[in-house]
Curated annotation (Swiss-Prot):
Residues 3-106 form the Glutaredoxin domain. This is Glutaredoxin-1. The modification N6-succinyllysine is found at residue 9. It comes from Rattus norvegicus. Has a glutathione-disulfide oxidoreductase activity in the presence of NADPH and glutathione reductase. Reduces low molecular weight disulfides and proteins. GO terms for cellular component: cytoplasm; dendrite; neuronal cell body; nucleus. Its main location: cytoplasm. It holds the Pfam family Glutaredoxin. Belongs to the glutaredoxin family. One of its GO terms (biological process) is cellular response to glucose stimulus.
Length: 107
């Protein structure tokens, strides 16, 4: 169930972030990504606490990405990590390049 839930969210050409609304790093990640000109429907924040499977989802994220912490940011089908990884990519210009590469931004 958790595996199915996560796998159906992760899609090429889309950015998906698994979050918990009370997490300050999740809020920072949302703030960073929400400032970018995404094409409609290509940025999704998934609140894992809205399901009854929060622990199972985090266990599957651990299996999939090597970490069960949130946020877990997927650019296309690739997990780039969490908030600090996103900040690092933003600072070195890699974030915009990757988002353009998957066609997620309005140019």
């Amino acid at each position: 169930m958790a595996q199915e839930f996560v796998n159906c969210k992760i899609q090429s050409g889309k950015v998906v972030v698994f979050i918990k609304p009370t997490c300050p790093y999740c809020r920072k990640t949302q703030e960073i990504l929400s400032q970018l000109p995404f094409k409609r429907g290509l940025l999704e924040f998934v609140d894992i606490t809205a399901t009854n499977n929060t622990n199972a989802i985090q266990d599957y994220l651990q299996q999939l990405t090597g970490a069960r912490t949130v946020p877990r940011v997927f650019i296309g089908k690739d997990c780039i990590g969490g908030c600090s990884d996103l900040l690092s990519m933003q600072q070195n210009g890699e974030l915009t390049a990757r988002l353009k590469q998957i066609g997620a931004l309005q140019l």
